[in-house]
UniProtKB/Swiss-Prot annotation:
The lineage of its organism: Eukaryota, Metazoa, Chordata, Craniata, Vertebrata. The gene is Ism1. The keyword Secreted applies. It comes from Mus musculus. Residues 38-55 have a biased composition (Polar residues). PROSITE patterns: AMOP, TSP1. Pfam families: AMOP, TSP_1. InterPro entries: AMOP_dom (IPR005533), Angio_Inhib/Adhesion_GPCR (IPR051867), TSP1_rpt (IPR000884), TSP1_rpt_sf (IPR036383). This is Isthmin-1. Disulfide bonds join 219-246, 223-251, 234-238. Belongs to the isthmin family. Residues 29-93, 125-144, 161-209 are annotated as: Disordered.
Amino acid sequence: MVRLAAELLLLLGLLLLTLHITVLRGSGASDRQDAAAGNNNLNLESDSTSETSFPLSKEAPEEHQVVHQPFPRQRFPPETGHPSLQRDGPRSFLLDLPNFPDLSKADINGQNPNIQVTIEVVDGPDSEAEKDQHPENKPSWSLPAPDWRAWWQRSLSLARTNSGDQDDKYDSTSDDSNFLSVPRGWDRPAPGHRTFETKEQPEYDSTDGEGDWSLWSVCSVTCGNGNQKRTRSCGYACIATESRTCDRPNCPGIEDTFRTAATEVSLLAGSEEFNATKLFEVDMDSCERWMSCKSEFLKKYMHKVINDLPSCPCSYPTEVAYSTADIFDRIKRKDFRWKDASGPKEKLEIYKPTARYCIRSMLSLESTTLAAQHCCYGDNMQLITRGKGAGTPNLISTEFSAELHYKVDVLPWIICKGDWSRYNEARPPNNGQKCTESPSDEDYIKQFQEAREY
C-alpha cells in the first residue's frame, strides 16, 4: 500500500510537469534562457526538500491536505548548459532524474521510496504584465512584519504602563483605550480594586430580575404631611416605585390662620367664646336639628368654601396615587395641590360605599378657610357626582386637625345614621366642571329609596 501511494505521488508530479510543459509551449517561450531559469528553480526546490508541500507520512498515507499559498516570485541569472535539462526540440522538455541529487538515489521499484517533489510555477513576462494592469483588484498591505510587531509591542507596553490607573478610572469611551490589548488578570479582580455603585442604575439579580431598593428620597415637604419614594430595578427598562407618607411639623402660619378664623367665628356668632361643637351643632341628637342650623357664620363660611375650593376633576388623576400633585383648575385658572384619600383610614366602604378612589385638596398659604375639597371616583375612574359614593366638601381639613375634622364632617354623618340623602343636602357634592352625571338616574333613584327606607 505504501509503495502504491508513492508511485501515485510520483505520477502526480510527472503529470504536473507535463502540464507545466504545455503551459510553456502555449506561452511561446522558445529561448534557452527561459529553460535554464526553470532548471535553476527546479534545482533550488529539490535541494530544499525539507520545506516541501507534499510530504508522505507512514502514519497517514491516505490523508492529504492541499494548502493554497502564494508562491514567491524569485529571479535568478540564467545558467546555460546545465546537464539536468535537455531539449530535443524547440518545444520538448525531458526530466533526467539521475542528475537530481535527491532523486538520483531513489529506488522506484523499492517498497518505500523516500521521494519528495516540489513544483513551483513561475509566472511568465506576459502574465506579469497582465497583473500589473489591475493593481487595484488586490488588497495592499503596506505594513511590513517588523513594523507590525513594533506597533504591537508599543501597544502592549502602553497598556501595561496604564494598567495601575485604569482599574480606578477606566472609561470605555476613552480615546486612550486600546481595544486590541487585553489587560492581565481581566478575569479576576486585581488587588486594591475599588467598585463604585451608582444609584441611577442599581444592580439586580439576574435570577429573579429584581434589584435592591434604593434609599428613601427626601420628604416632599418641609412642613406638614408629605411623602417619600424609593425605587428599584425590576428588569430591562423597568423601575418599581414605592411610596410612603412622612409627617413634618405643622407649617408656620397655619396656627395664625386658625386663630384668625376663630376670632372671626366668635365675632360672627356674637360671642367671645368660640366652640366649634356648638357652632356646627354636631352634639345634637337629631339629624334634623343639625340640618336646621342656619347661623350667619355658617352661611358666610360655606360661601367662602365654595369660592375658595377647587372643582373636582372629572376623572381620577393617577399622578396622585404615589405623591401629591399640582392639577390645573380651569375654572379658578390656577394650580391646586391634591393628594390621594383612598387609604384604609378613610374607610370608604363605610362612608362612601360605591367609591373606589378618593382625593382631597390640600391647604395653602393662600387659603381663606380651613376647608378641603373631597372628590370620589368609581371603578371606571370617573367622578361620582351624586348618590351615596359622592365626595362632599370638608369644612375642616385633616391637614389641620383630624379630631376637629371628625367632629365637624364625620360625626354629622353618624348622627344622620348614614342617610346620605340628608347629609348631601347640607353638604352638596361638587360638580363645578359639569362632568357626566354618575351614577345613572336608575341607580340614583334606587339608592335614594334605600336611604329613605333605612
